[in-house]
Amino acid sequence: MADLSLLQEDLPEDADGLDVDDYSSESDVIIIPSALDFVSQDEMLTPLGRLDKYAASENVFNRQMVARSLLDTLREVCDDERDCIAVLERISRLADDSEPTVRAELMEQVPHIALFCQENRPSIPYAFSKYLLPIVVRYLADQNNQVRKTSQAALLALLEQELIERFDVETKVCPVLIDLTAPDSNDDVKTEAVAIMCKMAPMVGKDITERLILPRFCEMCCDCRMFHVRKVCAANFGDICSVVGQQATEEMLLPRFFQLCSDNVWGVRKACAECFMAVSCATCQEIRRTKLSALFINLISDPSRWVRQAAFQSLGPFISTFANPSSSGQCFKDESKSSEDSSAEDKDRMRDNDVVEEEHRRPEDAPSDLSAPHSSARLESLEGCAAKTPGHSAGDVPAPVDSSLLCTLSSESPQEAASNDENGRKPDTNSKSASRPDAGTSSPEATPLDQDMFNSFHFWRTPLPKIDLDKELQQDPEERLSPERTGDVPAAPLPGPPNITMATRKELEEMIENLEPHMDDPDVKAQVDVLSAALRASSLDAHEETGGVEQRSELQDEVCVSELPDCNISHDTCVPLISAAEENAEATPDYVHGGADVSPGDGFSPDEDRRPKVQDVVPQALLDQYLSMTDPSRAQTVDTEIAKHCAYSLPGVALTLGRQNWHCLRETYETLASDMQWKVRRTLAFSIHELAVILGDQLTAADLVPIFNGFLKDLDEVRIGVLKHLHDFLKLLHIDKRREYLYQLQEFLVTDNSRNWRFRAELAEQLILLLELYSPRDVYDYLRPIALNLCADKVSSVRWISYKLVSEMVKKLHTATPPTFGVDLINELVENFGRCPKWSGRQAFVFVCQTVIEDDCLPMDQFAVHLMPHLLTLANDRVPNVRVLLAKTLRQTLLEKEYFLASASCHQEAVEQTIMALQMDRDSDVKYFASIHPSSTKLSEDAMSTASSTY
């Protein structure tokens, strides 16, 4: 406030002492007094007086300055409660200013004033609620757009900082917003109010959102007059769903979402496509699979290119929502125990889901002969639908069953089986889990039954809350399980939705007929392909209902049947069954992947490439659309960067499908890896280590390593992706495969642009991590030359990281047996750097010694023998920079060690003599650092001042 008088104050013309005619008659010198020679009237006013004076000024700029200085005025009078209240009352009057710029300036200061009031609440209780919040709420409906925007930003800032009480939100904020969204409200105000309601929902919580915001939000989604309102609702739909939860989403929001997805304005449909993943996360798996999938297919086939573009960008994230959220990693269980013990462990795991998280193991530890893993979703239904009764043999070979069949084919009745499947419990407490004995062995007491061929333990499907029994399940058990009928059971689940009505099939046929005349358009052709696939899937379901098992067997690509109970299934089959050899009782871990089943030990047959790209984790139509993103026609008709979006989401899709379905994605991944756009390849390079974790060591070695090798020879923009995660990828490989890359590490020193020093800095960072993966001999033979090369880099930032690399290398080689590699490395450091003809090399030697001391890479007695004599000889170096750094190292690092503080050895005496010599150095900086031990000055803070750098 003190500077307000200097801004726009009109001084009277006849002010005392300002007459320009005053002069000294003796010297004839005109004296022009300055305004600073006199006491300003403002300096005589109190803070409240100055506030009142300029708040009433006719000058708009003065009133703006009053609004801007309100916080300073409050700080001046904060000790007096009455003055604080007086300032707040002036704020209320200033809020009625007719000038929009003054009101906007005032609103910008409200969050700061509110925070001050919160901190000084004892002095001015309820100040914000009584004086400031009404202004914010009132400005939400201001006629001026700038004032409204400022008040909206202020309201969100206040909510984010939790400065508004919950009671005030319910009684003052929400009612105003609801009024602003009334049908007779201004169009612009209504649109902005809806946006505020959506943005504040995550801040106010589920209760207030459901009671006060959700009903009006649903109404706004159906606003038939203003598409801007519907567009705002669609853009924020995912946020509302995540706040209110699954039940409210499915009951109230999903019908509105379906309407918005079919809106006649493409901008609304595009907004729906962009938030599709968030909406999917708030629904159950059944709705996601049966309803949202079909809805998303419509968006992908939308007539508007912008809608299709947004839909394809969201396709990968939407597919990832089909992943099993309870166990997305790998876990193992010991198969050496009896089936009874395994059953007990399954019960414990069902009661405590934390066991899965506590038993994570790296994928590279998985042996090659692991049994086929199963998803946790199937574990939940295992207790009721896959248990065997006592006396049944666990050594029988199961035959594949269709995914439309109910999960249980045990000796219990179909009604009991369905009940147990829903409840997730075992029908018999004495029943055993499905555990296979050694190949070729069987229990002498147990008699193999045909039911074991159809054991659903080996097959995965999403558990549904209510399942209608198929006709074949309601048949007589003996007829259903007769050996003559086993060969008719299909080998793989069929794609497409499981239950499609006749009316739906009729609609699909009509849509295909309407689109056939426009088959020249690639987009229309793609839509017809999708609809045809859905129609075929519905036809398959119709055949299942009417034709029974015999007709469905003709629709399968391959059928894997075991007609005899004690026979083994051939490894050439394309259906991932669990054979007896892979289910032996050895003490090997059984991996369970979080997405779904994993084929045995990741061992895929040579015919795998010819396997149909069919799976049952996600709707097949969605996967087909995702795989089509690499089609060149998509880049022309949808988005030129569609391949980049496909590459970006591929790890999430792979995790969802699981490694047993990698054959569906392999060709797409190879296509992306050879894409002409380097941005696509760069995206894959940055995520290849994550994909390796998902696929496991065998698939990584077979499919990812060749692509990884190609990335190593690509552009620098692509190479940096694999370099940043080089350690993460190599640690997943077998030791022999990992050693092959030792010969290629040297290639990272060569870049397309020599000025790309960050590339070499990242290489040094990765080499530090790679030290743990290789033997001391490999480190000495291959990593040592690279590290010494980086220590002599032209850029100081690269050298700084390299000093750390060399010190860690010294530590590893010194602790190795025998320690000859460490001694040889130290001798090479002395020869190449300690006696280097260039002063920068000798300075680098001091830096390395300092890092070795700080990180305790060598015992002090070993350091004193191998490095310290050569370090002390640099006290006579002709370059002051080297001597300055030596003085810092001796004073601030070496003498800090207990070895030199407690012992009176000859080494300590040599150090003290060197320091005394440096204290008498002719350079003032050397004497300074050698004479004192400044506590506030550390080598890490000022060593760069003495380092030579190109940049």
Swiss-Prot record:
* Keyword field: Phosphoprotein, Repeat
**Keyword hit for Phosphoprotein:** yes
* Residue segments, region Disordered: 325-377, 411-451, 474-499, 590-612
Comp. bias intervals (Polar residues): 411-421, 430-445
List the PROSITE patterns: HEAT_REPEAT
List compositional bias (Basic and acidic residues) regions by residue number.
332-365, 474-487
**Database matches in InterPro entries:** ARM-like, ARM-type_fold, HEAT, HEAT_type_2, PP2A_Regulatory_Subunit_A
Pfam families attached to this UniProt entry = HEAT
Give all Phosphoserine modified positions.
Answer: S936
Role played: Regulatory subunit of serine/threonine-protein phosphatase 4. May play a role in regulation of cell division in renal glomeruli. The PPP4C-PPP4R1 PP4 complex may play a role in dephosphorylation and regulation of HDAC3. Plays a role in the inhibition of TNF-induced NF-kappa-B activation by regulating the dephosphorylation of TRAF2.
Please identify the protein, giving its name as recorded: Serine/threonine-protein phosphatase 4 regulatory subunit 1
* Annotated source species: Mus musculus (Mouse)
